[in-house]
């Protein structure tokens, strides 16, 4: 049966109900809790990655911003693991859904903005009007700054969706071309297969980079409001 090019991005359903939440939560069952007192290599690597990430993300924050440490670490681990699991064959990637990415971006962005208005009301309002603005340009700049503020969560979600979707489409297209060329030209099929392997390696890097970029931008929004 021929699949649509965008079939892998359709939300899977069971008895008419979306099972995205089940897909997202199921990988946690695959990692049993360790019973040993000394951590194994996998746990040591996880701790090292968490420490490195927290050092990069939280070094710019004050004490109020550092209260978001658990949220930021959980966010980067969730997005990174979801992106990596989506690279498995015949799997579903939740981060290709704009609705899910907006569901992550809007509450996090709103939380940073509300935190800013609660603790730094004057400084938050000052962002809408740069210092030294000529009087005739004040209404226009306030409108522009307001629009740019509300575009931030949309930019977060669209960036993640577009990058993950584009990579999956390229893998799908090059993989289909490789299968089609196997009966026509073995040498050409080998070249496209090599490109497919390199692109897959690149997608593993993109999956981690996009998780880092998403979390870093949330961290920067938090830094501007604390």
UniProtKB/Swiss-Prot annotation:
Where does the sequence pass through the membrane?
Answer: 12-32, 68-88, 97-117, 138-158, 164-184, 189-209
- Membrane-topology annotation of the record: Multi-pass membrane protein
Sorted alphabetically, which InterPro entries does this protein's record hold?
A: ATP_synth_F0_asu, ATP_synth_F0_asu_AS, ATP_synth_F0_asu_bact/mt, F0_ATP_A_sf
Q: Where is this protein localized, as stated in its record? A: Mitochondrion inner membrane
Give GO terms: molecular function aspect only: proton channel activity; proton-transporting ATP synthase activity, rotational mechanism
Matches recorded under PANTHER family: ATP SYNTHASE SUBUNIT A
Name assigned to this protein: ATP synthase F(0) complex subunit a
Gene designation per UniProt: MT-ATP6
């Amino acid at each position: 049966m021929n699949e649509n090019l965008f079939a892998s991005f359709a939300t899977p359903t069971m008895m008419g109900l979306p099972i995205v939440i089940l897909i997202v939560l199921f990988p946690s069952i695959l990692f049993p809790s360790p019973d040993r007192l000394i951590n194994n290599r996998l746990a040591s690597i996880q701790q090292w990655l968490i420490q490195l990430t927290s050092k990069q993300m939280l070094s710019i924050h004050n004490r109020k911003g550092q209260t978001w440490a658990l949220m930021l670490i959980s966010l980067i681990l969730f997005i990174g693991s979801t992106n990596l699991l989506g690279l498995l064959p015949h799997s579903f990637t939740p981060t290709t859904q704009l609705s899910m990415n907006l569901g992550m971006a809007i509450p996090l962005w709103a939380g940073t903005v509300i935190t800013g208005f609660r603790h730094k009301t004057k400084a938050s309002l000052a962002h809408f009007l740069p210092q030294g603005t000529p009087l005739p340009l004040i209404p226009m700049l306030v409108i522009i700054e307001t629009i740019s503020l509300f575009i931030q969560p949309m930019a977060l979600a669209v960036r993640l969706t577009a990058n993950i979707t584009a990579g999956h489409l390229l893998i799908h297209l090059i993989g289909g071309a490789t299968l089609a060329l196997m009966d026509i030209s073995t040498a050409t099929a080998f070249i496209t297969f090599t490109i497919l392997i390199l692109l897959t390696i690149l997608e593993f890097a993109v999956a981690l980079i996009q998780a880092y970029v998403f979390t870093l931008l949330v961290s920067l929004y938090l830094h501007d409001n604390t």
